[in-house]
Regions:
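Divalent metal-binding pocket/active-site signature
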Residues: 1-43
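H/E-rich (His + Asp/Glu) clusters that bind or coordinate divalent metals
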Residues: 26, 33-154
Length: 154
């Protein structure tokens, strides 16, 4: 991929998030610990293990419509991990539906339809829905950013 320069490759490892998680913060791991380039380390297995220990750890699904990251999609769609996924777009990185089509997530007609969609955020959303990510993946962030407040006493 390498659309954006990676400054400190070691920070892609979700284990660097242990301290904030131990302090009780809610944390979203970028790309759910998946690798960026062909020769980069794959940290997804660490992310999955960490979600078992840290209920406030989430992973974003930005750039999941590329082969190098998309290979983890089937695992991300399984419970309980799917409940820890949140939408991320990686905008302005371009979104293409080739991988979703080649993997059978979308048929040729849907692929062509979304490839012509000029709104890249809409294209990204529709392709990820076609890949199987449930609606909650795209709305979960609102609960995380605005936790419910205690009821006012009368």
């Amino acid at each position: 991929e390498h659309t954006v320069q990676v400054v400190r490759r070691e920070l892609a490892d979700p284990r660097t998030l242990e301290w904030p998680l131990q302090c009780g913060l809610t944390v979203i791991a970028a790309h759910s610990g998946t690798k960026s380039g062909l020769f980069d380390p794959q940290y997804f297995h660490h992310f999955v293990e960490m979600t078992r220990r840290h209920p406030r750890l989430y992973g974003d699904i930005s750039a999941f419509n590329v082969p190098i990251r998309g290979s983890v999609v089937p695992r991300c769609l399984q419970k309980p991990l799917v409940e820890r996924m949140v939408h991320g777009s990686d905008y302005p990185v371009p979104v293409f539906g080739h991988w979703a089509w080649l993997q059978g997530f979308v048929d040729w007609k849907a692929f062509r339809q979304w490839e012509r969609q000029p709104n890249v955020l809409e294209r990204d959303y529709q392709l990820k829905r076609a890949m199987g990510f449930p609606p909650e993946t795209f709305t979960r962030i609102s609960r995380m950013l605005r936790p419910s407040l205690p009821a006012k006493s009368a």
